[in-house]
Design a protein with these regions (language model features):
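Structural recognition of the beta-propeller blade-terminating site
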Residues: 24-27, 63-64, 105, 146, ...
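A short beta-strand motif characteristic of beta-propeller blades
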Residues: 29-35, 68-74, 110-116, 148-154, ...
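Short coil/turn segments within WD40 beta-propeller repeats
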Residues: 17-21, 57-60, 81, 98-102, ...
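Hydrophobic core register within WD40 beta-propeller blades
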Residues: 3, 43-44, 83, 126, ...
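Blade-level signature of beta-propeller repeat domains, shared across WD40, Kelch, NHL, RCC1
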Residues: 201-229
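Hydrophobic beta-strand positions that form the internal "hydrophobic ladder"
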Residues: 10, 51-52, 92, 133, ...
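Residue-level detector of Asp-centered blade-edge/turn motifs that repeat once per structural unit
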Residues: 5-7, 46-48, 87-88, 128-130, ...
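WD40/WD-repeat beta-propeller blade N-cap
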Residues: 35-40, 74-80, 116-123, 153-161, ...
């Protein structure tokens, strides 16, 4: 489901037996722990001894190294589809089936903002870099929150995946119908570059730096792309 890294230790959320979820840790050896809750869709390090679990049931939970509950929060929304943390793991951005995007303060454990002007329907993915928020979904929109302003690009195809560069200057999304990925500026929404996905159905995009990114999808191949190529 997802992987996180903290001080050379991997945290891995994966499928267990009979639909269960496992939380595994790998540094010099592999430790596998079974989660009690099967609805977890993502897991993150907060620090070396504290982890954050994200549930499709719109709940987040802070747990300790023994997987014991520290505290919970319920967003009281429809399904939570995706969530990401900022660089210092102090804030979380979540995207919901309702089309809302929410900003949550993990240190003070409270809601900060609700962004409801960008989407009308189900959000597939969100990203959060350098105080810029990106979202994409079934309403064929790419949403951007920058300097607290909500804006969106309207397209004519479903947008399953999107990502931000570390600076938040660039965003990229994939059009699987046309088989391309397009980079645009988050300041003026002008296109920067379009890439052919070479028959890859894009599912995830990760920026390595402000110019280079990886596109992966269904299958066993990944593509390395650069805005400078």
């Amino acid at each position: 489901y997802n992987i996180d890294v903290f001080k050379h230790t991997l945290l891995i959320l994966s499928e267990g037996d009979f639909g269960a979820k496992n939380l595994s840790f790998y540094k010099e050896n592999l430790q596998i722990k079974k989660l009690e809750e099967n609805s977890i869709i993502k897991a993150f390090f907060i620090n070396e001894n504290t982890y954050l679990l994200i549930s499709i049931g719109s709940e987040i939970e802070l747990i300790d190294k023994s997987l014991k509950n520290i505290k919970k929060f319920n967003f009281s929304h429809s399904s939570l589809n995706d969530a990401v943390l900022n660089e210092d793991k102090s804030r979380l951005v979540a995207g919901f089936e309702s089309g809302e995007v929410e900003l949550f303060d993990l240190k003070n454990w409270k809601m900060l903002k609700n962004y409801d002007k960008m989407h009308k329907d189900n959000i597939y993915q969100v990203d959060f870099k350098n105080n810029v928020i990106l979202s994409c979904g079934t309403d064929r929109r790419i949403g951007v929150v920058k300097n607290e302003e909500q804006n969106f690009l309207q397209k004519d195809f479903l947008i399953y995946t999107c990502a931000l560069s570390p600076s938040g200057e660039f965003a990229v999304y994939s059009d699987n119908e046309a088989g391309v990925s397009e980079v645009f500026s988050t300041s003026d929404f002008k296109p920067v570059k379009t890439f052919n996905n070479e028959n890859l159905m894009s599912e995830f995009i990760i920026f390595l730096n402000n110019k280079d990114f990886i596109v992966s999808g269904f299958g066993d191949s990944i593509m390395f792309r650069s805005i400078d190529e």
